[in-house]
């Protein structure tokens, strides 16, 4: 089922807890983009200047020899918004994909003007880091 941009943002764990008004403002700063099956959305090793929120369709994210399949409502490339490091994964369209491209520069400006939103996003980033830490501890004891 196709989601509206705000619905996709609302269902994204990355944006959970944000107000409807904030979600609408983020949706307005984004640019709708389309990808065909097999098309590269994000390429490992490249500089990241934007993140993508998937509106519909499925993708294949390959990192560290593992393949994940993010779908509607999920964000990909979000770490590029906070790091000057190269992309760590390749994301390709598993079929037709519609996404919202959120440029890093616009998103940074938005966060500077809205510190409470920045704190909410930071909480989500910290939660993801904790999940990764838990997995590493489970693998290596």
Positions of the model-derived regions?
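Cytosolic regulatory regions built on CNB/CRP/Popeye-like sensor folds
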Residues: 1-141
């Amino acid at each position: 089922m196709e989601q509206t941009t705000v619905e996709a943002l609302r269902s994204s764990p990355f944006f959970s807890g944000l107000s409807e008004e904030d979600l609408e403002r983020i949706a307005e700063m984004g640019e709708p983009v389309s990808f065909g099956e097999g098309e590269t959305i994000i390429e490992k090793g490249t500089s990241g200047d934007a993140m993508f929120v998937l509106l519909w369709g499925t993708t294949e994210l390959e990192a560290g020899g593992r393949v994940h399949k993010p779908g509607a409502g999920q964000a990909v490339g979000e770490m590029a918004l906070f790091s000057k490091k190269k992309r760590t994964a390749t994301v390709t369209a598993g079929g037709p994909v519609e996404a919202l491209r959120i440029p890093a520069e616009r998103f940074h400006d938005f966060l500077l003007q809205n510190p409470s939103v920045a704190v909410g996003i930071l909480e989500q980033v910290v939660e993801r880091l904790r999940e990764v830490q838990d997995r590493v501890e489970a693998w290596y004891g």
